[in-house]
Amino acid sequence: MTVPRSTLRLQFHRGFTFDDAAKHVEYFAALGISHVYASPITTAEPGSMHGYDTVDYTQVSAECGGEAGLKRLVDKLRAHDMGLIIDTVPNHMGVGGSSNAWWLDILEWGRHSAYARHFDVDWHSPDPALRGKVLLPTLGASYGEELAAGRIALHFAADLGRFYIGYGPHVFPVCPTDYASILQSADRSDLNALAERFHGLTTQPTDHPRAAEGRDMLREFVAQNGGTAIEFALETYSSGDPVTRDRLHRLIERQHFRLAWWRTASDEVNWRRFFDISTLAGVRVERPEVFEAVHALPFRLYQEGVVDGLRIDHVDGLAEPREYCQRLRQRLTELRDTAPYVVVEKILGRGEPLRDDWPVDGTTGYDFMNDVGALLHDPAGAEPLAQTWAELTGRSPRFADEALAARRKILAENLSAELDRAARALHRIARDSLSTRDFTFTTLRRVLTELVVHFPVYRIYPQNGLRSTADNVYFEQALEGARRSLARADHVALERVNAWLGGSAEEAPAGRGGVPQQQSPNGAPPSHAGSARRTAQTLFSQLTAPVAAKAVEDTACYRYGRLLSRNEVGADPGEFSLSVEQFHASNLERSQRFPHAMLATATHDHKRGEDVRARIAVLSEIAQDWSATLRAWSTLNAPHRRALDSKPVSSVGQDTSYDWAPGPAAEAMLYQTLVGCWPPDLQPDDEAGVKELAERVAQWQLKALREAKLQTNWLAPDEAYEAACREFLFDILAPQRRDGFLKELSAFVARIGRAGALNSLQQTVLRLASPGIPDLYQGTELWDFSLVDPDNRRPVDFAKREAWLAQTPPSEFLSSWHDGRVKLAVVQRVLALRAHLPELLSHSEYLPLAVRGKHASNVIAFARRHGNAWAVVVASRLAAGLLGEKGDLPMVDPEKWENTAVEMPPDLSARALFDWLSPAAPKVDENGLLYLRDALGAMPIAVLVEDGVPRS
């Protein structure tokens, strides 16, 4: 297996192509990267900036450079001994435009499309209006309104010989069985003759070739005679006249789709979406033919040696993640002699392990991002900050309360259709037994709701219809929550649902007196019973996962603001901090179970850049100070609040009412965000710089307000409230405030900036030296003060980074830490060590090291050992109090460490060590102690190796 030493995540799109990346390969190599880790490379919706809306799995994106461009990039990578890992998206496809041939085919032919089973469509909807149809919630207003306004119209694509319903940029193919009536409507002999080609046509697959021949004739007819005749036919379906509009409506009603207002999606959509996004349709990759079709391109590229590994997007969306990973591993292994490198995007809950029976190399690193992020937080700040949040906002101090409320809201308002579908699956099971046939759909829906809202992780992974012991750990928690919430009368149904969802083996349905009912002749349960249970289990799992993502990450994390540095993808804001011992335990477990898992601290999906989080984490160390600052700023900026509903604006700083904009919660979160993302070198009198920052923060603010779904949301935006929030932001950052709030904000950031930078360097070295494969998100080798997308996907100035790359020890840049070169140097130096001694930081033992002395709690240390080679990593932590008010460097004055020392392994007591990051060569004394005043005398972090290892 080609195991990466380190990866660099690059976001490809038409503004940054494969050829653009190829220009910087020399820089990537010099930085120490072994593999470029590419965003999805398959053809996506036109203009896609992320690639996760695939429309053609078989082609490399032409906008990104096509297959030729990809191979040029790979040739450049190979010339520098580098490889390529690609992101694959097997869970869903983009269906929001007119570029997805598979999707257009099912709209054209319905259940008889060759791709009808490629997508997760419920063709047997209980709604007669949707039976055999696909709901298309794409209209900007009600269907009747859009039809009357003429925005829905019949069109003809001359180059394809196809009739279609057009709506804006959308194309909805008309079934060829209707072509004859359309052509005959013009009452022209030439069109009547063409109509004969379509008479008697059915939707059966055997008739599809005949339809294709008819379309060819239509295309030839128009090419030879022009489009005038077809225009006559189209006029008979014009929306401008009531009669022809009714004909158009009846034509649309006969199609295999139902056009609907976009607001209907949450309640009525009859196909699986990616989360609640109605432009992304779930793909049934569990079907062998779909699996092969989806992976044909990556399999070929892997077999050809173009690609070295795969990242699997949203593995929890799949029907069978375990089986998928097993099949993927088997197929890749068949294609090449070397073992493939495969990682999965899997969000792990608190204490949840990645399953051992998944043949993958690990996760994409959100679990490490959570661990190292929590390590930066002082547990002493948890309660006072929660209390401050509750007092200022009137909201709960517990994240769990916000998460539970958000789960209920998401189920009721965003994923109601998905909940109904899962409940119907349970209801079908209930109807198969005399003992459960009286469980109503409403009862089962109520029971299912409580299980889902209390489910603590993304999902379960049943095997052969039964949950595993690991599954039961989390299912029991959901059961307990459901029992507390449900009326006792529903507990019987709850226990049966528990059994159906994998809690017990299948039993023959029992009738009165325990006599089995509805058995086959050999006494077994009905043959469909097992299938029905597995369907219900799949639908349950494909419901809990999006509910967790949308409710926790995309709702509660925007409502709860104790400290925003913990509100991150893959994190639990209720888990405020992690001890050194817990961090070591996680590293040890990873080194033993998934030593090649990715280690991330920034991603294309993060809510705040890694250095934003590192700076905000400092507030946990100064909780009382921050609480006072929040109150002071709230009072200072009270005059800039905006009135809502003509009510007077409070001038009181601590006003927990929500009659004003932005409101207490949004205001408190805004201050944290400004503190976190304020650039280190930005001055309050820099009008252009402050305005640029304000625009970026305003973009974040709008998204945050809508995601919170409190006073505005994506479904029904309150534009007046949003505008008032924006005005408040620009008012408090206006140039005339440079001697007021702006000055205070800048001064506060300057006061905690060194501690934030120290946290950043600690986080950086831990990612680079911990067990696993360090992943670098594009551009974050310098300070990363980005916010949520699209801010974290801005163009990267690689030329600047390349110009700043040097062989100079990081300690030389510490005095100018504001520009970020010290971070760049740390990344380069530690990755160079990985290149010099690849086994030492990848396949080695992980040994936590004890620290003693006055400030032992302010240090983390561990050793990596491979054979006779050693590396010792030491880093300052929770150092805001030790830094003090004086000084310019993000490091503790060496003398302040006093008697604090690392207890070194006996094997290192007599060896000469030097710091890989500075000229220092600290000594281990005769008692095996390494004093921090020596180890951290030049930098807040150290990577100690034996003398004799080349420094460059």
Which ranges hold each PLM region?
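Acidic/aromatic/glycine-rich contiguous surface patches that form carbohydrate-binding/processing clefts
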Residues: P456
